[in-house]
Amino acid sequence: MSVIHPLQNLLTSRDGSLVFAIIKNCILSFKYQSPNHWEFAGKWSDDFDKIQESRNTTAKEQQGQSSENENENKKLKSNKGDSIKRTAAKVPSPGLGAPPIYSYIRNLRLTSDESRLIACADSDKSLLVFDVDKTSKNVLKLRKRFCFSKRPNAISIAEDDTTVIIADKFGDVYSIDINSIPEEKFTQEPILGHVSMLTDVHLIKDSDGHQFIITSDRDEHIKISHYPQCFIVDKWLFGHKHFVSSICCGKDYLLLSAGGDDKIFAWDWKTGKNLSTFDYSSLIKPYLNDQHLAPPRFQNENNDIIEFAVSKIIKSKNLPFVAFFVEATKCIIILEMSEKQKGDLALKQIITFPYNVISLSAHNDEFQVTLDNKESSGVQKNFAKFIEYNLNENSFVVNNEKSNEFDSAIIQSVQGDSNLVTKKEEIYPLYNVSSLRKHGEHYS
């Protein structure tokens, strides 16, 4: 049975008039017009072919060695004295049983003037720069593609809207001027690094205008470095026992971090002080399932070791609330930040959904989630939910009308697309955060 591939992420423009959605290797654009009317505004697909790129690389190498090979061929003879001619090297290609190749699109960000959209593509480990034209039939136009040696994992855009900070899978951080011309071969040196995979990055400044880069990694570290003098480490924030998957920054130097621990950490990143921790383990317990059982080789005799991790933590822009979700669960947890005691966190609300949450994002004072709705019966729905703050009720509520109309817009936009309408077994892996957890084998 074929289904529409679940949405992997959402990004909304400042005024809410544009929404970008990631499905597999595509970015879909939608215009939102009140009341609750959606209009499809184009699609961009990453058609980069890894196998073809491998062929091109091999061809260049062969061409460079052709003259040398011709000379050597004259000297090669068989046992009968016949000349032996070298054969061209085989082009590497996936063989039988090779793992599938997934061309994820990640890390959607808009520049502050919203004239450009920045994203990352796994296909060629690149940073994508799009022009955004709201008057065009297809609002996105790919302008540049900066390729890296390792996969970009997280990005942050500087206030000048031209500098992008990229953290990669290898542990290095780079600074790219998106107005520059992309190099054919990546030669840039990193501006700072970790000895572990980077998971998040933020470029921020203090009240004196000094800039800092905050990075988190798989080795439970949070590092604060001066920018652009990144060789100067300002401080480390120690306290996590497991990997850090997500960080977010608030006013007055507040930093929130989460990951493989069963706690949310609140910090004053300027002083390095751990302000508080919020233990959410009892709150999430009713939502855990078989997907949270530890891998068999790390289980006990009773097979009851549970492992879970926060996939994303994000702050409301104007309200004192922060939301997060645990991977492979059907809820988001909203916390209230104390206005009297900096860093104090208290439970505000838990919102449940019919399917597992895949992604969490924020637009002003609205939270948005995408759901793993591949098991939806009948007409597929529940692709995403838009969650608004109701001042009268002093609580967050799902805007069902807006969400339902968005479902209809998604269905109409992908009709006849054999790439986005796929078999269930061909859906991209949607739960990757838990793989960051280290076990005994990583320390041996």
Curated annotation (Swiss-Prot):
Region (Disordered): 55-92
Keywords: Nucleus, Phosphoprotein, Repeat, tRNA processing, WD repeat
Feature: compositional bias, Basic and acidic residues: 71-85
Phosphoserine modified-residue sites: S93
WD repeat residues: 1-47, 48-99, 100-147, 148-192, 193-237, 238-279, 308-354
SUPFAM superfamilies: WD40 repeat-like (SSF50978)
PROSITE patterns: WD_REPEATS_2 (PS50082), WD_REPEATS_REGION (PS50294)
InterPro entries: Trm82, WD40/YVTN_repeat-like_dom_sf, WD40_repeat_dom_sf, WD40_rpt
UniProt xrefs under SMART domains: WD40 (SM00320)
Pathway: tRNA modification; N(7)-methylguanine-tRNA biosynthesis
Main localisation: nucleus
Compartments, as annotated in UniProt: Nucleus
Domain of life: Eukaryota
GO cellular component term of the entry, any: nucleus
Single biological process term from Gene Ontology: tRNA (guanine-N7)-methylation
Family recorded in the similarity comment: Belongs to the WD repeat TRM82 family.
Quaternary organization: Forms a heterodimer with the catalytic subunit TRM8.
Job of this protein: Required for the formation of N(7)-methylguanine at position 46 (m7G46) in tRNA, a modification required to maintain stability of tRNAs; its absence resulting in tRNA decay. In the complex, it is required to stabilize and induce conformational changes of the catalytic subunit.
Name of this protein: tRNA (guanine-N(7)-)-methyltransferase non-catalytic subunit TRM82
Species name: Saccharomyces cerevisiae (strain RM11-1a)
